[in-house]
């Protein structure tokens, strides 16, 4: 089980923390096709999810991310599972926590975009978006998540609501906020790495960074542009 020292090391700017890797890719490699709801596996095939967590743990991960990237109401509704938001997120966190056991390993509740456009780019209001994130995060907390990782966001308006939701469900829980960029080094909505860093910093994320979409060299170049404009710990 993680300890207060685990979180202290996690937030220490001089300490490198190693996360696990992709969950969906690993599940796909085990025969789960992409037309299925991967989040539902937390209750339908928990042993498969446990096996992925265990493999990352044995590889040396300091943090296990929950299998909950798409476990929000709008995305689950595409599979007729919108009534199971709390159940699937709670199960996701419990699975990761069970695999971590008594090891000094943290469990991060993984939260991805809603899959719908939020204002001003779409019909979903900011209040609605924040409510969807809150609902998901409550399930993750109930299952034992010790921090939140907001991943692969394209829209700064949306990730702001996710950060605000995290603070509403637990004012002290560590929050990692990560955007995605294209080969031009910009977010899909045109934000520069500097814009991203300043915004995520101002909204109170404890760790800020980038993930997905482009290779490590492009990510590194963008992270190097973020570093001078923030004192936050960086993730990639």
Indicate where each model-derived feature is located:
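Domain-level signal for soluble alpha/beta catalytic cores
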Residues: 1-236
């Amino acid at each position: 089980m993680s300890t207060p020292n685990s979180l202290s090391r996690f937030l220490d700017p001089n300490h490198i923390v190693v996360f696990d890797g992709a969950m969906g890719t690993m599940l796909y490699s085990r025969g789960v096709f992409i037309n299925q709801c991967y989040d539902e596996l937390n209750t339908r095939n928990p042993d498969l999810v446990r096996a992925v967590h265990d493999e990352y743990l044995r590889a040396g991960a300091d943090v296990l991310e929950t299998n909950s990237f798409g476990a929000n109401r709008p995305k689950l509704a595409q599979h007729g599972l919108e009534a199971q938001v709390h159940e699937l997120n709670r199960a996701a966190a419990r699975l990761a926590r069970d695999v971590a056991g008594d090891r000094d390993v943290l469990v991060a509740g993984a939260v991805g975009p809603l899959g719908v456009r939020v204002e001003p780019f779409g019909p979903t209001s900011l209040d609605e978006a924040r409510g969807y994130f809150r609902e998901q995060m409550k399930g993750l907390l109930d299952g034992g998540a010790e921090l939140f990782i907001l991943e692969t966001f394209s829209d700064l308006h949306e990730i702001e609501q996710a950060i605000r939701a995290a603070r509403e469900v637990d004012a002290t829980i560590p929050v990692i906020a990560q955007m995605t960029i294209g080969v031009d080094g910009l977010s899909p909505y045109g934000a520069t790495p500097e814009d991203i860093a300043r915004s995520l910093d101002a909204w109170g994320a404890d760790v800020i960074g980038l993930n997905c979409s482009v290779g490590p060299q492009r990510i590194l170049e963008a992270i190097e542009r973020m570093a001078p404009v923030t004192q936050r710990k960086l993730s990639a």
